[in-house]
């Protein structure tokens, strides 16, 4: 049985008296690519923010690597996020005054890693992600796809326990979307745990495990196994399952 790296029990969250999450139980296995799907307003991003410690739930407990993180102070939680979690958002989160290369190397030093080693690993990442030609450009001077690939590099450079991705391709065209998804699939194949929120079936196909969220409740779960490009049966299986959930 796979080790559970992140666990949530009884997670509930309300905004202005409206329940967004209600009594959610969820396990994230180490090395998995878990996708949380659901329609707009289902509570997907709220659940991701709760699990990552970005927004505390009203009720419930969250454990990371077997230890409770629910009662950590904001300072402790900030340190944990900086050292253990990587984040990719729909809107590209990069420091505007730093070059793409500097954005990634600064993030890589969060664990007080050797600077020379971080630079070497960043160079390898930029080669792998086809960013070497724009490494010295500011975020404002590159395309959306290039910026988001740099954001992926920034998220993984410190070898985080989990990469949290909230609609990471929502602002990209199909070509750039596939480029970012290929990167996420690649790091997952190397053993990285990924938790991604999406409303797009094309993106969800990259996951090996799909959780369907509806009106603040987990309605179903589907195991897809490893991703295989152009797998028609995989696509049909996910499509049929989503239809059964009321998608």
Give a label for each model feature.
Residues 60-68:
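Conserved ABC transporter NBD signature motif
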Residues 52:
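Helix-to-loop junction immediately C-terminal to a conserved catalytic motif
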Residues 82, 137-140, 158, 190:
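Conserved signature/switch motifs of ABC ATPase nucleotide-binding domains
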Residues 138-142, 146-148:
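Conserved ABC ATPase signature
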Residues 163-166:
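Catalytic Walker B motif of ABC-type/P-loop ATPase nucleotide-binding domains
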Residues 68, 105, 116-133:
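Conserved ABC ATPase "signature" region
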Residues 98-107:
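Short coil-to-helix segment of the ABC ATPase nucleotide-binding domain corresponding to the Q-loop/switch region
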Residues 131, 135, 155-156:
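ABC ATPase C-loop
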């Amino acid at each position: 049985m796979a080790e559970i790296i992140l666990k949530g029990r009884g997670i509930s969250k309300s905004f202005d008296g409206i329940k967004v999450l209600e009594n959610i139980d969820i396990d994230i296995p180490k090395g998995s690519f878990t996708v949380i799907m659901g329609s707009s307003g289902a509570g997907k991003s709220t659940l991701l923010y709760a699990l990552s410690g970005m927004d505390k739930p009203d009720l419930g407990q969250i454990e990371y690597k077997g230890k409770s993180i629910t009662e950590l102070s904001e300072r402790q939680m900030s340190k944990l996020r900086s050292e253990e979690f990587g984040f990719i958002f729909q809107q590209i989160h990069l420091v505007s005054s730093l070059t793409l290369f500097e954005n990634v190397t600064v993030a890589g030093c969060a664990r007080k890693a050797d600077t020379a080693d971080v630079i070497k690993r960043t160079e390898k990442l930029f080669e792998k992600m086809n960013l070497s030609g724009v490494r010295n450009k500011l975020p404002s001077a590159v395309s959306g796809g290039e910026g988001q690939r740099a954001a992926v590099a920034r998220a993984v450079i410190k070898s985080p326990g989990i990469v949290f991705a909230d609609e990471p391709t929502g602002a990209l065209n199909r070509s750039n979307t596939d480029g970012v998804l290929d990167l996420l699939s690649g790091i997952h194949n190397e053993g990285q745990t990924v938790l991604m929120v999406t409303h797009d079936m094309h993106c969800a196909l990259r996951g090996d495990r799909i959780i369907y969220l509806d009106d603040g409740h987990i309605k179903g779960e589907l195991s897809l196994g490893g991703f295989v490009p152009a797998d028609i049966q995989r696509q049909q299986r996910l499509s049929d399952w989503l239809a059964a959930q009321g998608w």
